[in-house]
Design a protein with these regions (language model features):
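…; additionally, a secondary subgroup of soluble metalloenzymes is captured
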Residues: 1-102, 109-254
């Protein structure tokens, strides 16, 4: 079933790739490819893994062209896809304005395919709506994460916060202004009175400890939590033979 299903959808994906897809079209393509990655994780004997990997590489090359063709216009115009620095105005501020409490959870380095493996568990606890947005360039942590909390493109927040430019040269300082960025953005959105709780979690043990005390912060209007240990694992894997043996490929990472 997995074999016949993918072979049928293979041509549909190829057709969409050749149709100059919009951002919404690219999201549809990406979802289809991730779906088959997860399917083949469970049915590794299909013999189609290499074909899927080649199709993903082909899609990546075409997506790069999509970014190259559009990015310079997106950074100066309003007619653009939703991007990560739109997160607070679009996803958070409206709920705060309605008087709702919000928990903003940023899982650094968690990919969409990783998230999809958690969906079964999460759906039993939450009503889930996935609203995609486009990463900024560079997509590295110092730029993308700071963009989320500042609500600005990197050149904009570097101009507004010149001390951040110097901090970016130091590995331990690249994201030390995030709480300030978020507070300032809330003020610009007329949400200065929001009670904010901001927390960074670097290790699993810290996460477990935080979980046991999370009730202390439930009176906050906005809980913003950054989880770093997925990103740390990703970087450590490239330097550790033990981790490479434990997580030999993308399937193992999921």
């Amino acid at each position: 079933k997995a074999t016949s299903g993918y072979l049928q959808e293979f041509q549909d994906i190829e057709s969409k790739l050749s149709s100059d897809p919009s951002f919404a079209g690219w999201w549809e393509i990406h979802n289809k490819l991730v779906k088959w990655q997860l399917n083949f994780d469970e049915h590794s004997d299909t013999g189609l893994g290499n074909i899927l990997a080649d199709q993903i590489q082909s899609a990546n090359r075409a997506f790069i062209q999509f970014i190259e063709n559009g990015y310079s216009n997106w950074v100066v115009g309003q007619n653009r896809p939703q991007m990560v620095h739109d997160t607070i105005p679009i996803a958070v501020a409206p709920k705060l304005n309605e008087g709702k409490k919000v928990c903003l959870l940023v899982l650094d380095c968690m990919r969409h395919d990783h998230f999809m493996t958690l969906m079964t568990e999460l759906r039993s606890l939450f009503d889930i709506v996935i609203d995609p947005s486009l990463a900024l360039l560079p997509s590295a942590t110092p730029y993308s994460r700071n963009a989320i909390f500042s609500g600005m493109f990197p050149n904009e927040f570097c101009k507004k916060y010149p001390e951040q430019v110097e901090a970016m040269q130091q590995e331990k300082g690249v994201n030390r202004f995030e709480e300030i960025f978020l507070s300032d953005q809330l003020s610009r959105l007329d949400l200065a009175n929001v009670k904010l709780h901001f927390k960074k979690i670097w290790k699993v043990s810290e996460g477990n400890n935080y979980q046991s005390h999370v009730g202390d912060y439930l009176d906050s209007d906005l809980m913003a939590i950054v989880v770093n240990f997925i990103d740390i694992l990703a970087h450590a894997r490239s330097e550790s033979e033990v981790l490479q043996e434990m997580v030999p490929d993308e399937s193992g990472y999921r």
